[in-house]
């Protein structure tokens, strides 16, 4: 072979080698990525070639699949009470899959490796392939109470069983009905477009219970109280403190912070300070403990890390900050921000004698033949405070409901502990405040429910905004719904 021919042969050989490398790269390295690419139309067509499995609440399906007359997509997803359940289910559509629909897509489509046996049997017997089911921990009555309680208000509710970490309710309003955009028509496209944030300032697709953080306001004072007890700064909830009213904010030019209610707060005990939401006491505690200790305590309750339920919840933030900002963070202001789920976790840890359980919303994954392929077991997440200190805080929080600022949460014959909050925000804190309430109900078998409620726009009159007026009645309804199911 002469020299020019050898060059051509070498060049052709290199081209063939490059082609083989590329083919193998696509086949073996990029295969999973291409198969799961949301823009891969073949994947979408296959996903909707069969009925999906269902998401289950208390034995009932809240999702379904119906046949279509579309040439490419044989089935589309349907939702029962779609707006109410959207913060739990998410959606499965040609646009995307989210939340439980997205996390467990392979189970619901039947493509999960653990369903190989079921797929094989279906193929051999000629049965249509079906997906597995996702069995949730949700309580339908509690979810409905939260959804109807919020009504047309913008806000969120999270409810947990403190003993196990099971999520009982997860509501975000305004919401959306996923059924309106699960098909392949122009109407579906219009419905999808109308829900996008750029076209809808209310952002109904934002999961406020998990993905929005708010200044927690005075509800955070129970964390500051826990920090005081756990670090030995105060010995018991009835020991008097020595913080002035008004409180001089440190390292400022004489700035002072006072209280909304006169007469109760000078030298108040933790019980009295929680009952009447004394800013001055908790400013003093946070300042005296310092930023590092306050950050550490907040972290034991779950702050500063994402929480997976398995749906991801945004990390709540107790910030590393200067002295005056740390003092303000101790009353739930400044850069302190929390999700409703996080504040439900705070109430749950106190109600469960200081033990915080990992929150979760999926109990089981079930194959089409009803075999359980995955079971969630309750797991301890942390111990933010001792049982003794937790029980002391329970006593104080129950005084808040019985004698203090949370009278609207009272339930006849039931011990209820709670804490109200009114969180300032906006430029110069001039926006309509957020109304907060966190609570738990106690029975002879421990606490079956802890709740956090936030209402963003409950009233346009600043003087009418308050956790007791706007948020506590919703929490009460949720707690009563759970308690009714215990009987």
Question: Residue spans of the language-model regions?
Answer:
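Glycine- and acidic-residue-enriched helix-capping/strand-helix junction motifs
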Residues: 463-469
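Beta-lactam-recognizing serine transpeptidase/beta-lactamase-like catalytic domain environment
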Residues: 168-218, 223-457, 467
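Short beta-strands and strand-coil junctions in structured, solvent-facing domains, enriched
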Residues: 144, 460-461
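Short, gly/Ser/Thr-rich active-site loops of penicillin-recognizing serine hydrolases
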Residues: 373-379, 471-487
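Extracytoplasmic/periplasmic proteins that interact with beta-lactams or build/remodel peptidoglycan
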Residues: 1-156, 171-213
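Cytosolic beta-strand hydrophobic patch enriched in CBS
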Residues: 157-161
């Amino acid at each position: 072979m002469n020299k020019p021919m050898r060059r051509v042969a070498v060049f052709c050989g290199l081209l063939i080698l490059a082609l083989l490398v590329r083919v193998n790269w696509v086949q073996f390295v990029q295969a999973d990525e291409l198969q799961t690419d949301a823009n891969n139309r073949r994947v979408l067509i296959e996903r909707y070639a069969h009925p999906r499995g269902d998401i289950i609440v208390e034995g009932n399906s809240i999702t379904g699949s119906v046949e279509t007359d579309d040439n490419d997509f044989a089935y589309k997803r349907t939702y029962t009470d779609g707006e109410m359940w959207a913060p739990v289910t998410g959606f499965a559509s040609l646009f995307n899959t989210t939340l439980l629909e997205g996390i467990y897509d392979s189970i619901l489509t039947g493509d999960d490796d653990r369903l190989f046996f079921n797929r094989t049997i279906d193929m051999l017997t000629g049965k249509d392939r079906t997906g597995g089911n996702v069995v949730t921990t949700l309580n339908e009555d509690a979810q409905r109470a939260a959804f109807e309680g919020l009504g047309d208000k913008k806000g969120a509710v999270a409810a947990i069983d403190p003993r196990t970490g099971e999520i009982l309710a997860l509501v975000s309003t305004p919401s959306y009905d996923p059924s309106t955009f699960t098909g392949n028509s122009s109407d579906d496209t219009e419905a999808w477009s109308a829900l996008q944030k750029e076209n809808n300032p209310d952002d109904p697709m934002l999961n406020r219970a998990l993905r929005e953080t708010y200044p927690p306001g005075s509800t955070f004072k129970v964390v500051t109280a826990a920090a005081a007890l756990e670090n030995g700064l105060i010995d018991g909830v009835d020991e008097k403190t020595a913080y002035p009213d008004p409180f001089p904010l440190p390292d400022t030019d004489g700035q002072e912070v006072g209280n909304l209610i006169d007469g109760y707060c000078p030298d108040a005990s933790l019980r009295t300070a929680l009952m009447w939401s004394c800013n001055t006491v908790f400013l003093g505690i946070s300042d005296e403990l310092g930023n590092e200790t306050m950050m550490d305590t907040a972290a034991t309750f779950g702050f500063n890390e994402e929480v997976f339920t398995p749906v991801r919840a945004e990390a709540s933030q107790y910030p590393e900050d200067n002295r005056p900002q740390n003092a303000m963070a101790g009353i739930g202001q400044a850069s302190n921000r929390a999700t409703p789920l996080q504040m439900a976790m705070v109430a749950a840890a106190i109600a469960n004698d200081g033990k915080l359980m990992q929150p979760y919303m999926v109990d089981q994954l079930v194959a089409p033949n009803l075999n359980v392929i995955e079971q969630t077991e309750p797991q301890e997440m942390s111990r933010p405070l001792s049982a003794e200190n937790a029980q002391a805080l329970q006593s104080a929080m129950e005084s808040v409901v019985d004698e203090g600022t949370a009278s609207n949460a009272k339930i006849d014959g039931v011990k209820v502990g709670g804490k109200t909050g009114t969180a300032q925000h906006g430029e110069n804190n001039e926006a309509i405040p957020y109304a907060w309430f966190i609570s738990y109900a106690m029975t002879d078998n421990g606490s079956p429910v802890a709740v956090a409620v936030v209402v963003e726009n409950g009233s346009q009159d600043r003087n009418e905004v308050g956790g007791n007026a706007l948020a506590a009645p919703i929490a009460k309804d949720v707690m009563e719904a759970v308690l009714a199911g215990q009987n």
